[in-house]
A protein has these predicted regions:
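Extreme N-terminal basic, low-complexity initiation segments
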Residues: 2-10
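Active-site helical microenvironments for divalent-metal-assisted chemistry
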Residues: 11-12, 18-285
């Protein structure tokens, strides 16, 4: 579904955006900078939400760089669609949103928006370095290299070797964070894929990406990747468990509160300072 375009228009478009963005103090910042995008306000592919998140922790200059990356990516991916029919640029914006929610830096967010341009368009790594600097180009290159290695075995020993190989290839932790966010959004939109491909990607997610997220201590990614992998690999089991858990949700919460209170009383009786935190297990666990 993807079509390549010559790199010339991409780099020319990005170069034309090197001047600072105009800012109307009578409008909110997100509305001001989004109003200048092609096709605005008809569609922003998630950029309004992204900009609003970025405003909470990045400078205007950093957000302007990310907006330039969006226009560079939109030009590079022009005419490309995902299996769902959505414009392709909506995917890297969603990946960037995941990282913005974690308050990653401007370079990582920029790389997230550009992460598929080298592999899937005729924009080059040199174009990215020229427009956004060597740091962003290095992150995009790192993600592209991870995309080139293929997982082919379900054997646990080989899966572990594959995880070690991926982690060994990474010189910057932000590379794997972009890749994990990329995988998460792909899993969230996996329904548009053929059944066989869904199963393969779900297995790969459970064997490779969820364990890496766990190893890095990114519990949110781990939980979401595991549940989504489970949903697509074992859909019947997932539906049965999901239905059962929804029925018993109230009882589970009461049980967690009760057990937490019992532990807290025991600690107090023994004069032990501590904090007890209870949580409900997610579906895959």
């Amino acid at each position: 579904d993807r079509r390549l375009i010559p790199p010339g228009p991409v780099t020319a478009r990005a170069a034309s955006l090197s001047t600072p963005l105009g800012y109307d103090r009578g409008m909110d910042y997100a509305a001001t900078i989004l109003a200048r995008l092609p096709g605005a306000p008809r569609r922003d592919h998630g950029m309004r939400q992204l900009v609003e998140t970025l405003e909470t922790y990045l400078t205007r200059e950093q957000i302007e760089m990310i907006m330039r990356a969006y226009e560079f990516g939109a030009a590079a991916h022009k005419g490309q669609t995902r299996k769902s029919g959505e414009p392709y640029i909506s995917h890297p914006v969603a990946v960037a949103q995941e990282l913005a929610d974690m308050h990653l830096d401007a370079q990582a967010i920029t790389a997230a928006i550009l992460h598929d341009t080298v592999e899937d368009t005729e924009a080059s790594l040199e174009d990215i370095e020229e427009q956004f600097g060597p740091e962003v180009a290095g992150l995009v290159d790192g993600v592209s290299k991870l995309d080139q290695i293929q997982f082919r075995s379900r054997a646990e020993a080989q899966a572990e070797s594959f995880r070690k190989m991926m982690l060994a290839m990474i010189e910057d932790i932000r590379v794997i964070l972009v890749k994990l966010a990329d995988r998460l959004h792909n899993m969230q939109t996996l329904g548009a894929m053929p059944a066989e491909k869904r199963s393969r990607i779900a297995r790969e997610t459970l064997d490779i990406y969820a364990p890496i997220a766990n190893r890095l201590g990114i519990n949110r990614f781990k939980v979401l990747l595991e549940d989504l992998g489970f949903k697509h690999l074992y859909p019947m089991r997932y539906r049965v468990l999901d239905k059962a858990l929804k029925r018993s949700k109230g009882n589970q919460r009461q049980m967690v509160k009760k057990i937490t209170a019992e532990f807290e009383r025991t600690l107090e009786e023994e004069n032990i300072e501590g904090q007890v935190i209870g949580r409900e297990k997610h579906l895959y666990s």
